[in-house]
Amino acid sequence: MSESSPALGPASGAALGPAPRAAGGAETVAVARFLNATRAEGPGERTAVWVQGCAIRCPGCFNPHLWSFRGGERVAPADLVRRVLDAGTEGLTLLGGEPFDQAAPLATVAAGVRAAGRSVMTFTGYTRAQLDRAVDAGRDDVAALLATTDLLVAGPFLADRLDTRRPWVGSTNQEFVLLGDRFPDLLDAVSRSPDRVEVTVDAAGGIAVNGWAEADALDELLASVARPQPRRASFERR
């Protein structure tokens, strides 16, 4: 998909974003961020993968830097499955960006993760109706990712319909959809799980935030984290 392609928008009734690649083409996932373990992106301890690229581009999106289809680390599905399983968590959460704009390779990843007995949770800005229409129109890649997802969170973010009562969602229109009965406890966990925010500071001082919080609270948190702090030298006698 080129950068000049129009955004579909949260209210668009248009078809889904990028179509499957030509047969025989090498499929990779454009990964913007890989987080080994988190308790802020779904029930239990999960590995989270944010993909690069989104055709929806909801106003007020928390991750506008992930809209562009340029960038990200290109990772083969088999390598991504191995990284997820090596993390040793309860399952995989797919976010973005828009996972269904990379449905074909992500379906391969999800299938590999589920084959190892782990659960898959997928966030999408498309509505369930849009996904169903895409499947009816012959989008086998979309059907495959739906078939390998245990818990779907569907619907665009709507800034004028903020949801502060349910975990993991940003607006009241977004819905939890349990796909199949393999992991029925996932949906039950929604009512028992609080919103969380996790802040990671790397060795170079870079700050990464994931999870869910109201904008004002998040701004205050980031300001406090970014504020220079006095340093105290420490050492250990041997």
Show where each model-derived region lies.
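P-loop/Walker A phosphate-binding loop and immediately adjacent motor/lid segment at beta-alpha junctions
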Residues: 102-114, 162-205
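N-terminal [4Fe-4S]-dependent radical SAM core
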Residues: 1-50, 59, 63-69, 196-198
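Receiver (REC) domain switch/active-site residues of two-component response regulators
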Residues: 150
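Flexible glycine/acidic-rich beta-alpha junction loops that bind and position SAM and/or redox cofactors
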Residues: 71, 131-132, 156-170
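Radical SAM enzyme core and accessory elements
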Residues: 3-16, 206-238
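Short secondary-structure boundary segments
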Residues: 124-125, 155-157
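Conserved Radical SAM active-site core
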Residues: 27-36, 45-46, 62-144
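A cross-domain feature marking catalytic cores of carbohydrate-active enzymes
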Residues: 51, 96, 122-124, 201, ...
